[in-house]
Amino acid sequence: MTVLDFQQVSFIRNQQFLLETINWQVKKNEHWAILGLNGAGKSLLLQLITGTLWPSSGQRTVLGERYGKTSVPDLQRRIGWVSSALQNKFYGRDLAEEIVLSGLYSSIGLYESYDENQLDQAKALLADLGLTHLIHRSYHVLSQGEKQFVMIARAMMAQPEILILDEPCTGLDLFAREELLARLEAFSKLTNTPTILYVTHHTEELLPIFTHLLMLKNGKVHAAGKREAIFTEEVLTTFYDQPILLHPFTGDRIIVTPK
């Protein structure tokens, strides 16, 4: 099954290409990392995936539904999105499990009634991430890393088929980052895990679970495909426009440094 299919997708603003001729396919059972420097077009690409923006040209098919021939709100409910910016929108006194529950309704805060089964589901999602200790704790006392874990559990509450993690380690210290990545790797191995799209510009965050990479550069696809084929010194040197070196990092990860 094709999870995502972009064909000749471009986005123009003020007569300038911000994304140009994007051709990209994601298949079921693939987890992708999207790598790009600031201004490469990563955020625009995500908004085109979720239907928040409309392209200037090209066709987008997501989860078998073609934009323009399907209900955008219905399709958006099948996509989970986690970003650091979302953390600050929630109310500090809400309990962690209440924030997770709000993912059922895509709301900031919990205003709908819920039953015990739904509450148990929220607690189970926290448990899946190894976060049972956060149950009954107020959001405002959580660390930045814990808040990000709660956001991931919230996104999973609606059982999405795609989970977008938009620079989830932003604002985390070294130890919180490593904890988040470890929990994400464990989570990815659970049954019925959605397709994960992980956005970053830090190569050391690229876990082995990411089978494929998309490199965005100046609004264009610089390289896309299986990780082992494109995560090389040769490709990365042209991506960064300067010589680089690859160094082994913890957990079978690799860090890139200037040569």
Which residues does each PLM region occupy?
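Conserved ABC transporter NBD signature motif
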Residues: 58-68, 75
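Catalytic Walker B motif of ABC-type/P-loop ATPase nucleotide-binding domains
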Residues: 163-167
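Conserved ABC ATPase "signature" region
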Residues: 116-134
